């Protein structure tokens, strides 16, 4: 493990970062710049440490859209997709099936949950209402990406478990070029 890519600073996406870094001390932790404030002691309540275990950690790198993260044969492109959190980040990369040579375009949206854009949540957290518009604009931008395999930041985002049950005998049960646009439209 050389890099720990965090999609956003909610406990279920960053709560294990320090543990992972303990297993791989050389690994660099990445996070969207606009989510760094979640990690400040005065804002850690937004991660719900009273309900979920959270060990503070240091971020080594912030994502830059103009700088892919290169890991072996992968170049992972990052996209700022504010909404679920201000620094929510989405990922895009290509993978080649070595047996067939076919290139698959893969993407994961960092946080599709609209629960954080409700009036009540925004008031409670002090986050700006402008996140709603940023979310819409980022979804329009991402929707245009050609994606063969949509990866959900939670299994239900892409019906991942149901797809595995239904299409598990296929080489790529998650391959569905229409799914990314459907996800963006929902």
Model-derived segments and spans:
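Active-site HxH/HxHxD metal-binding segment of metal-dependent hydrolases
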Residues: 1-68, 170, 183
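Short, basic, glycine/proline-bearing loop/turn elements
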Residues: 2, 115-127
């Amino acid at each position: 493990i050389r890099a720990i890519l965090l999609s956003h600073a909610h406990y279920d996406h960053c709560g294990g970062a320090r543990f992972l870094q303990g297993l791989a001390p050389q690994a660099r932790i990445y996070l969207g710049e606009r989510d760094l404030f979640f990690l400040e002691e005065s804002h850690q309540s937004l991660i719900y440490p009273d309900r979920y275990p959270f060990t503070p950690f240091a971020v080594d790198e912030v994502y830059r859209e103009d700088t892919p993260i290169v890991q072996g044969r992968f170049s992972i492109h990052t996209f700022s997709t504010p909404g679920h959190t201000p620094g929510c980040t989405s990922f895009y990369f290509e993978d080649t099936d070595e047996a067939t040579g076919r290139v698959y375009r893969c993407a994961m949206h960092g946080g599709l949950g609209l629960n954080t854009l409700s009036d009540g949540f925004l008031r409670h957290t002090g986050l700006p209402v402008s996140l709603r518009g940023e979310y819409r604009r980022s979804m329009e931008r991402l929707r245009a990406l050609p994606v063969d395999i949509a990866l959900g930041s939670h299994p239900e985002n892409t019906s991942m478990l149901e797809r595995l049950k239904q299409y598990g005998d296929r080489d790529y049960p998650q391959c569905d070029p229409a799914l990314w646009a459907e996800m963006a439209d929902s």
